Structures are given as C-alpha cells and as structure tokens.
C-alpha cells in the first residue's frame, strides 16, 4: 500500500489556505481537514469543545494545543484519511508540529508556505464572505458573488466571519508571527518546506501549488 500523502498548508490568517485547500483536495481526491472549520462546526453545535474554543477564537488567539491535538488526531484517524489528506490551519505551534511529527513517524509531509504580505492579509480579511450553509469562501472584491449576498455555489446567505473584524485580524496576525511563523524554519530544517507566492490571483496560486507537488501516483 502507498504511504499516505500528507500536505500541510502553512501561512498567515487569510493567506488563501482554505481557498486553495478546497481546490487541491478536489484535484487529488483527498479530504480537506481544516482545524478552523472543525472548531466552527463545534461552535455551531454548541459542543463542550466548541464552548471551550469560543473565547480564544473570538479574541484571535490560538486554542490550547491539547484541545487541538485531540480533535485533529480523531479526525485524521477516520477511514477517509487513509490515503492522505490536506491540512489547513494545522499545525500552528511548535508543540503541535512536534506531536504531529511523532504521530506521522516515517511519513514525510509536504509543507507549503503561503508567502503573503500583512497588508494583503488585512485587505483579504476585510472583504471575505463565507457561505453559512456550505462554507464556500468568496470575497467582496476578489471573488464577488454573482447575486449580492448569496453564495455562488448553493445560493445560501454569505456572511462575514466574526474574527475578520479589523481588531481581531490585527491580533491574529500578531499571534501568527509569534507562534506559527517559527514553523517555517522548523520545516525548512527538516527539508520538507516549499514556498508559494500567495500574492498572485487564486488561479495562478493554484497552478503554482500544483507545480510544487509530486505527480499523483497511480492507485
Ligand atoms: P482558521 O479558520 O484556520 O483561520 P486562519 O488560519 O486564520 O485562516 P483563514 O481561514 O482566516 O484564512 P485562509 O488562509 O484559509 O484564507 P482564505 O482562503 O479564506 O482558524 C480560525 C481560528 O480557529 C484561529 O484563530 C484559532 O483560534 C482556531 N484554530 C484553528 N486551528 C488552530 C490550531 N491548529 N491551533 C490553535 N487554534 C486553532 O482567503 C481569505 C480571503 O481572501 C477570502 O475572501 C478569499 O476569497 C480571498 N483570497 C484567497 N486567495 C486569494 C488570492 N490569491 N487573491 C485574492 N483574494 C484571495
């Protein structure tokens, strides 16, 4: 059996990880595992985990590692992840990366670092629109809805994420530089990091991303 194909999308909040993860997962037939989406699902369902994560997310802070790791490990243990998966928003701290590395053992992940300037991040967060029903990501300027306020994919309502408020975005960026950016050096040292220019159009980013990945092996 082939080794699982584990792709980690690293980058600042709003760098375009979610947008590209959906496309990449579809292109490679792999599940898209987003810790942010998993937490938002838990928030919506008002689970104990969602209640614990709520305050951290609303403030732009990271949820404590132990909560993230339990949730993530349970998700990637599901049968749909056996051939691999696309990780979006995980790992985000050195302890998360180390714990995940131990779990992967001899499997080497491919880590893609989305390089995007802070000014671009602020602009993208300010205009982001997310579908309440299917989670599709659009943007008021860069991916405008065909019908105002409605999702292009399923026509449900598009909303702004509460953590895209300007003050929270500033805090998320600060937290990113302090706690997540050190992972770039960590994975560089491990020899598994590939840099991606995330300032290009979504289509050009996708082409560059596919160019950084090895060709898909036959099943
Ligand atoms: P999470 O949901 O992971 O948020 P994030 O990493 O902050 O990333 P975003 O979803 O904001 O951005 P993205 O890079 O996916 O960009 P997108 O494609 O949407 O996490 C939320 C919270 O959960 C965290 O703050 C934390 O509290 C908690 N959490 C999650 N994981 C955790 C972990 N591992 N540890 C601890 N806590 C955790 O794009 C943004 C916008 O730009 C969109 O509108 C899009 O249309 C547009 N856009 C995208 N690409 C382009 C482009 N190339 N050109 C123009 N516009 C573009």
Residue ranges and their predicted role:
Residues 1-219:
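Glycine-rich phosphate-binding loop of ATP-dependent small-molecule kinases
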